[in-house]
Amino acid sequence: MNPLLQDYARILLEWNQTHNLSGAKNLSELEPQITDALKPLEFIKDFKSCLDIGSGAGLPAIPLALEKPEVKFILLEPRIKRAAFLNYLKSVLPLKNIEIIKKRLEDYQNLLQVDLITSRAVASSSFLIEKSQRFLKDKGYFLFYKGEQLKDEIACKDTECFMHQKRVYFYKSKESLC
């Protein structure tokens, strides 16, 4: 793991002791989650902008932003302590490419258009698509980090679902929604 990702992990574990941001209690539990956040970089198309919904403890947005400093990330996180954590990360790590918005997806009224929309452990895929597609460029993609329950949430083709260990990555273009 690169040093910046190690710094992120260390800070998250420190904050986690008092703020309960993640279920991970140590680096050996957190490291696979960071690897999981970065895995889609192996198969997704290049992107210049990303909206992360329900950023929480920063997964997947912070590892992605650290690995892709040229990409603009907008992190939507409505909970105060989690937004404070994300703002702290921005102040101590080289994360000039992120903007933290303390709002729920349903309350976010910006006209922004992004290349990629990500989310991990927030809501059903169909809900996320319905509420967020207006922020996605016509040639953009959704990337949702899901578990085996994905097939119960939404119909998807094998070409839209990528598996790694127990994770299912749902990767679907906006164009294919029609």
Curated annotation (Swiss-Prot):
**Has the keyword Lipid metabolism been applied to this entry?**
no
Q: In the Enzyme Commission scheme, what number(s) does this protein have?
A: 2.1.1.170
Primary subcellular site in the record, as a coarse category: cytoplasm
Q: Which InterPro entries match?
A: rRNA_ssu_MeTfrase_G, SAM-dependent_MTases_sf
- This protein's source sits in the domain of life called Bacteria
> What reaction(s) does this enzyme catalyze?
guanosine(527) in 16S rRNA + S-adenosyl-L-methionine = N(7)-methylguanosine(527) in 16S rRNA + S-adenosyl-L-homocysteine
Cysteine disulfide links: none
Q: One GO term of the cellular component aspect? A: cytosol
- Give the protein's recorded name: Ribosomal RNA small subunit methyltransferase G
List the source organism.
Helicobacter pylori (strain ATCC 700392 / 26695)
